[in-house]
From Swiss-Prot:
The protein's name: RNA pyrophosphohydrolase
Keyword terms of this UniProt record: Hydrolase
Entry superkingdom: Bacteria
Function (record text): Accelerates the degradation of transcripts by removing pyrophosphate from the 5'-end of triphosphorylated RNA, leading to a more labile monophosphorylated state that can stimulate subsequent ribonuclease cleavage.
Nudix hydrolase domain boundaries: 6-149
Coiled-coil regions listed: none
Natural source organism: Klebsiella pneumoniae (strain 342)
Enzyme class, spelled out: hydrolase
EC number(s) stated in the UniProt entry for this protein: 3.6.1.-
One annotated Gene Ontology cellular component of this protein: cytoplasm
Assigned protein family: Belongs to the Nudix hydrolase family. RppH subfamily.
Gene3D superfamilies in the cross-refs: Nucleoside Triphosphate Pyrophosphohydrolase (3.90.79.10)
Length: 176
């Protein structure tokens, strides 16, 4: 489903823990990392798509998370010309995204990247809040900056009220 301007409706998901860190996921078989995201199906609300993508990509359900916030507006990014599929009609030139900030209320062990026959990710880790803005692929950077800026006050207040962890594991491989 591509809109009249060539953008595909999509949801993005920022998952934070009680310390205000965010989940950073490694794309399957690649060296690139990003937040979970995915398309909105016809007839599906942004929130419904978010819960579907949450389960498909990281194996979490509604009971594992709490919605803390969502972006006020749709945020857009254009794909680099080399990634646009010009032979597919209608042509998709980018994504327009509704973002959700979720708090993991379950356990790290509930995260499972292997719920789909074609997994999006093969590993993940908790990172500091602003880390993804510097690390995501360049064409998504402006959207990430805007999302993180919009969600910052909610996440920081959560982190201020949480006990500090003793130690944090660096990286987790897929489970399955």
């Amino acid at each position: 489903m591509i809109d009249d301007d060539g953008y595909r409706p999509n949801v993005g998901i920022v998952i934070c823990n009680r310390q205000g860190q965010v989940m950073w996921a490694r794309r399957y078989g690649q060296h690139s990392w990003q937040f979970p995201q995915g398309g909105i199906n016809p007839g599906e609300s942004a929130e419904q798509a978010m819960y579907r993508e949450l389960f498909e990509e990281v194996g979490l359900s509604r009971k594992d998370v709490r919605i803390l916030a969502s972006t006020r507006n749709w945020l857009r990014y254009k794909l680099p010309k080399r990634l646009v599929r010009w032979d597919t009609k209608p042509v998709c030139i980018g994504q327009k995204q509704k973002w959700f900030l979720l708090q993991l209320i379950g356990n790290d062990a509930d995260i499972n990247m292997q719920t789909s026959s074609t997994p999006e990710f093969d590993g993940w880790r908790w990172v500091s809040y602003w880390y993804p803005v510097r690390q995501v692929v360049s064409f998504k950077r402006d959207v990430y900056r805007r999302v993180m800026k919009e969600f910052a006050s909610v996440t920081m207040s959560l982190a201020e009220s949480a006990p500090k962890p003793q130690s944090a594991p660096a990286y987790r491989r897929k489970r399955g």
